[in-house]
Amino acid sequence: AGKTVAMQNFLTDSQMAMGARVANTHKFEDTQAGARPYFLFFGRLSKEKGILTLVKAFLQAAGLAQGSANAQSDDQDVQVLPDVWYLHIVGDGPERGAIEQLIASAGPQAASRIHLLGYKSGEDLQREVGNARFTVLSSEWRENMPYSGLESLAAQTPIIGARIGGIPELVEEGKTGFTFESGNAVDLSNSMLKCAAVSALNYSAMQHSCREYVNARCLQNEYALALIDLYERVIQR
């Protein structure tokens, strides 16, 4: 009892099968996912999840927030999100009203590009994940290893992740996604612009990296073998 060991989550075989089934490896050509690419947040709509920061960041990136034109980094390949880019928000929670007010205050174009989709589960949710261009983990508290991130990688959807808690362990910069400073809407906005500039070829490589991450770290058998190895090393000491 002299040691405490924390290991990351693993995905069950059924979750892996679901991820493979909903993975969309032709998003750029897909009639819906290609013509209207979207960022996806799925989870509880609460302050600690950074949902208001995310909405503000999207408004800035899309040029729909006051002063947003001056907020972007000069080295971005894309200065403003093309108007075909959307933000999908799946879930419910105490900040829904504040989100609706924020969207309404930004005008009708914001309302047309930010979709509050409510609660989803099962394959309905997973298809939303699989068709998203990027998911966003905007948490502002220290999560160990958010399951939503693992589900996203299993569906070969790269992540925009806050640099807090265990989230950076999921995101290899430019490979499985991009990171930003937690709580910083401008930094998140700039990450969104990076995403919009990713070519089809580079995106395909990112999807491959997502699949490789899950295969190397999150399969049940791999997890069990790593756990057995860890126990054996602890016992030997």
Give names to the regions the model predicted.
Residues F10:
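Carbohydrate-associated surface elements
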Residues E29-K49, T53-L59, H88:
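Conserved donor-binding/catalytic core segment of Leloir-type glycosyltransferases
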Residues D77, A98-K120:
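Nucleotide-activated donor-binding/catalytic signature segment of Leloir-type glycosyltransferases, i.e.
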Residues Y119-K120, R127-A132:
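Short alpha-helical donor nucleotide-sugar binding micro-motif in glycosyltransferases
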Residues Q126, N144, G149-A154, P168-E169, ...:
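Short alpha-helical segment that forms part of, or immediately flanks, the ligand-binding pocket
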Residues G130-N144, T157:
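Acidic donor-binding loop of glycosyltransferase active sites
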Residues E173-G174, F178-A185, K194-A200:
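Conserved acidic donor-binding segment of nucleotide-sugar-dependent glycosyltransferases
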Residues L201-R217, Y223-A226:
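A short, well-ordered alpha-helix in the C-terminal region of glycosyltransferases
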